[in-house]
Amino acid sequence: MSDSTGRINSKASDSSSISDHQTADLSIFNGSFDGGAFSSSNIPLFNFMGTGNQRFQYSPHPFAKSSDPCRLAALTPSTPKGPLNLTPADFGLADFSVGNESFADFTANNTSFVGNVQSNVRSTRLLPAWAVDNSGNIRDDLTLQDVVSNGSLIDFAMDRTGVKFLERHFPEDHDNEMHFVLFDKLTEQGAVFTSLCRSAAGNFIIQKFVEHATLDEQERLVRKMCDNGLIEMCLDKFACRVVQMSIQKFDVSIAMKLVEKISSLDFLPLCTDQCAIHVLQKVVKLLPISAWSFFVKFLCRDDNLMTVCQDKYGCRLVQQTIDKLSDNPKLHCFNTRLQLLHGLMTSVARNCFRLSSNEFANYVVQYVIKSSGVMEMYRDTIIEKCLLRNILSMSQDKYASHVVEGAFLFAPPLLLSEMMDEIFDGYVKDQETNRDALDILLFHQYGNYVVQQMISICISALLGKEERKMVASEMRLYAKWFDRIKNRVNRHSGRLERFSSGKKIIESLQKLNVPMTMTNEPMPYWAMPTPLMDISAHFMNKLNFQKNSVFDE
């Protein structure tokens, strides 16, 4: 949510501001290189016209009008010359240096300086000359056997174009001798295997082996990963893809050995890393609960739970874990999952207030409140033990206010009634300002969203938009809540109209612009729990409006 008050969603945005570009110094474009953007920088001013007198500067051949309207023809044909082998001295840079670096060192250590010059170099730069044609492309007649026999397999695997060649010619048939030759050469040395996994190109050929490995090869690959820094592989941008593919494609018993190795190490960094988080998500999603029960027990400890939930990536992992634990109660392992879920939810409820006030952890509490099925009992516990008696303070917090909104929306009738009563009558008025909780929230930058949610709930009920069918006594209670909010808004309408949030509150109340009733008289047609066109007036007059309800006072 956002409005002019500056409230934004608590999830961090990845977009960047362009204000820096709008105020950038554009003197470099004014046609003068004296001073300006270059006067105080370390960027060298190259004299590409030579060091001699300007009257001896190079002059191009004169041109005449060509038959082609888009071209000019040279009067004096130029003589073809060999490749130019220029040095810094040819540009007046014989004594050029940056700090203590020579020109050669400067260009070697500053790839951005030479990046534009070398941008036309093909991706086949790592391939041997015999493997490419005159255009720099891989030869059409090249075979996989040629690559292996010439000892260029690693060169191809580390090259973007070369690895595509290997993937196209990969021998998927386990009976093919070349399959075993490739596997042995790429995995026999731990350093080579690790380098390929961490390479932007090489990881693809390793994934290919993972996908088509025999059971024996799967065992060997698992040993290679465990012996060559499994945690580091999970944290790497490219190697983590190999681990994910292994969990997805390997036999379950073999994949569980990878997870067992992770559980024996310090895997807390994996829970908060942008790359490693995908590995753990694969584990939770694809493997049986017995493989990752250690992770749930790890989260049940308060310090670990707070560390993971307060991370932008970790909070999503916790949500997925809760979802998997509460999923499909008909499975035979549900009792085990329910025990682990109960331990995790106990820890969440115990730290609910701190979690709700955090930028990312509040999403975990929201997720519990919005879940259904077996999670409803934990939703009610969180509302009763954490939110009640703290609604006013939490509604004024940037992140906890999201939790309060969700609680109003998903609370069962009895708890919803208690929450409404707390806002209306649960706090002593301020002695100096004579303001109660509703007055405070109406004008608060975050609390006003809670009031808007209260209004929305009342309107949905009174217009018959609620999924469940409500009795008349419940409808009267919703009408009473709506009437109290409307009277308070009317009292402060002059001040509320000064703010965009106040205008939204006034507009939302106008959606139900009909006088309220709080008497025991039969309900008016507009307040019936179902659409009027579906109910006859004769049926409504016979309704008994005095049925008992959990809302009856």
Swiss-Prot record:
> Gene3D superfamilies this protein is in?
Leucine-rich Repeat Variant
Tell me the InterPro entries matching this sequence. Answer: ARM-like (IPR011989), ARM-type_fold (IPR016024), PUM-HD (IPR033133), Pumilio_RNA-bd_rpt (IPR001313)
Annotated knockout phenotype: Production of viable embryos and predominantly normal oocytes with a low percentage showing misorganization. Does not affect germline development in adult hermaphrodites. Impaired repression of glp-1 and fog-1. Simultaneous knockdown of puf-5, puf-6 and puf-7 results in abnormally small oocytes, disorganization of oocyte nuclei and cells, inefficient yolk uptake by oocytes, embryonic arrest with impaired eggshell formation and cytokinesis defects, impaired repression of glp-1 in late oogenesis, and mislocalization of rme-2 to the cytoplasm instead of the plasma membrane.
The molecular function GO annotations come to: mRNA 3'-UTR binding
BP terms from Gene Ontology: cell division; oogenesis; positive regulation of embryonic development; post-transcriptional regulation of gene expression; regulation of translation
Q: What subcellular compartments does it reside in? A: Cytoplasm; Cytoplasm, P-body
Q: Name one Pfam family in it.
A: PUF
Primary subcellular site in the record, as a coarse category: cytoplasm
Keyword Cytoplasm in record: yes
- Give me the Pumilio repeat coordinates as residue ranges: 146-184, 185-223, 224-260, 261-296, 297-335, 347-384, 386-421, 432-472
Q: What keywords does the record list, in alphabetical order?
A: Cell cycle, Cell division, Cytoplasm, Developmental protein, Differentiation, Oogenesis, Repeat, RNA-binding, Translation regulation
| Gene Ontology CC annotations of this record | cytoplasm; nucleus; P granule; P-body
Q: PANTHER family, alphabetically?
A: PUMILIO DOMAIN-CONTAINING PROTEIN 5-RELATED, RNA BINDING PROTEIN PUMILIO-RELATED
Q: What does this protein do?
A: RNA-binding protein that binds to the consensus sequence 5'-CUCUGUAUCUUGU-3' in mRNA 3'-UTRs and modulates mRNA expression and stability. Functions redundantly with puf-6 and puf-7 in oocyte formation and organization, early embryonic cell divisions, and repression of expression of glp-1 and other maternal mRNAs in late oogenesis.
Recorded protein name is: Pumilio domain-containing protein 5
Source species: Caenorhabditis elegans
